[in-house]
C-alpha cells in the first residue's frame, strides 16, 4: 500500500483528557477518532490492527472446533426477561423501543440469543456438543467511559458459546478453549497470565481471566513465587493463621478520640501501629432489619465479593444505612465495634491470633484499647474477608504471593445451567429423557487487546507493535520521493520486490518533510523500516532499522529485501 492511496492522520500532541499511554498513542497515531464519550471510529490504520487480531482469533477458534456465526447487536427484551437479566443488569444495559413500542436492548453479551437459537435448533444428544462463536460490536452504557477503547461504551468482542450433554463434555471444551485463548495471546506477542476469577454478572461456576501484565492495569492479580498459582485479587483466598493466639497483656480501656473517624486518624491520634487496629464494616443481613458486623485489620483491604458469599449476609452486598447503624450500635460509623453488639459478627482470619486490639467503642468519639476476642466480646466466626497482600502464603501451599497489575482481555466461564435452566434449553438423552444442557462461554475483548498491547509495547517515540499485530510489517521511507528520480526508482523497486515476497508493506510516498516521515514511522510502530536517500544510494546502501530497539544500519541495496524477509520469517 502506498501512503498516498492510504490515510495517515497523526498528531504531535495527545488530547489533555488522555491518561493512559494507549489512549494517547492511539489518538496521536490516528488509529481512532472520538465521536462522543466512549464512542470511536476505527480509522484505516487502526482497523488494520483490529483485523490482524481478528484473524488470529478466527484461526485459533477454528483449530479449537468452534464454528463462526453472527448474532444481532439489537436483542429482544423478552429473551433478557426470560433469563432474569433485564432488570438485574441495571443501567449499563441500553434499552430502546421500536416503532411498535416493543422493547429491545443493545447487547453487551449474547448468552440469551445463543441459548434461544440452540433450544430451537438442537434437540438430541446426537447433536452435542456444539461450539459457536462470533465477532461482533457490543454496547455497554458505562457510567464514566475512560481510557480510550480500554473502557469504551461501544467495543468489539469475540464471544464463543458451547453446549453439552454432560459436565465432562463441558470441562473438555472449557480446557480446549482455555488453551486456545492462551495460544491467541501468545501469538499476538503479549505477556499475560491466566488467573482464577469471579464470575461477576455473567454468572456460572468455574472462571478464568486472561490478564495482560501492565502497570496501568485496573486489575490486581496475585501469583505464587514458586508454583503456577495465579488469581484475580478479588478471588485469591487468604488462609487461617497457624499457631496460638497471642496472650492478652492490656485491660480494656475506653479512650476519648474526638473527631477520629478513620483508621489513619486513629493511628495518628494514638500513635500506634496500624496493624494493631480493627476496622468495622456493617452490612445488611438476609432478614429484614438484621445487621452483620465485619471486622478486619486496619491495614487490610475489604473484599466485598468474599463478604457477599457469607451465610446470613444479604446478596447483593448492601452497606447498612447510617440510621440503622445508630439504632443498633448507638454510634455513628468510625466509632463501631463488637462490644455490646448482639448480632452476627465475622472477623477476618488475620485477626484470629492477635491480642490487645484498638477498636470502636460504640460511642461517638470513643475507642477501646486492649480489646480481646473471647474476653471482651464473644468469639466471632473467623473467615476470609480481605484481599491478599504480598508475602501471604500462596493458597496452594507453595511459596508466597506476589502482586502485579493487569488488563483483562479475555474471560472463560463454565456457565453450567445458569441460562439453559432459566430458558429451558433442553435435549433428549440416549434414553429419550429430557435433560438441561450444560453451557460454557469464552470471550475476548478484541478492541481492548489492541489497547493492552500498546500499554505493553511503547516508548517515548510511539507504539512498538508486535509482529502479529502490526498494521504493516515494513515501512519504506524515501527522502524526496517526489523530487529524486533515483530515490523513487529504488523505493518502487524495493516495494515491488517485498510485495512479491509476501510482505505487508507501506511505501510512505507523501510529500512531507523528512522529519515528519521519520517521526510518523516511529509513532506508528511498524516493526521494520527502510530509509532511502540520495546520499546513501550513492554508496549503494539504504538504511535499515527494527522498531524494537535496534540502531539503524547501512545495508547494501541489493541485499535489503533478503535481509528484511529473513527477519520477517524468523
From Swiss-Prot:
It comes from the Bacteria. Keywords: Aminoacyl-tRNA synthetase, ATP-binding, Cytoplasm, Ligase, Nucleotide-binding, Protein biosynthesis. One of its GO terms (cellular component) is cytosol. It holds the Pfam family tRNA-synt_2b. It is found in: Cytoplasm. The keyword Protein biosynthesis applies. It catalyses: tRNA(Pro) + L-proline + ATP = L-prolyl-tRNA(Pro) + AMP + diphosphate. One of its GO terms (biological process) is prolyl-tRNA aminoacylation. InterPro entries: aa-tRNA-synt_IIb, aa-tRNA-synth_II, aa-tRNA-synth_II/BPL/LPL, Anticodon-bd, Anticodon-bd_dom_sf, Pro-tRNA-ligase_IIa, Pro-tRNA-synth_IIa_bac-type, Pro-tRNA-Synthase_IIa_type1. GO terms for molecular function: aminoacyl-tRNA deacylase activity; ATP binding; proline-tRNA ligase activity. Its EC number is 6.1.1.15. The keyword Ligase applies. It is an enzyme of class 6 (ligase). Homodimer. Belongs to the class-II aminoacyl-tRNA synthetase family. ProS type 1 subfamily. Consists of three domains: the N-terminal catalytic domain, the editing domain and the C-terminal anticodon-binding domain. Catalyzes the attachment of proline to tRNA(Pro) in a two-step reaction: proline is first activated by ATP to form Pro-AMP and then transferred to the acceptor end of tRNA(Pro). As ProRS can inadvertently accommodate and process non-cognate amino acids such as alanine and cysteine, to avoid such errors it has two additional distinct editing activities against alanine. One activity is designated as 'pretransfer' editing and involves the tRNA(Pro)-independent hydrolysis of activated Ala-AMP. This is Proline--tRNA ligase. It comes from Neisseria gonorrhoeae (strain ATCC 700825 / FA 1090).
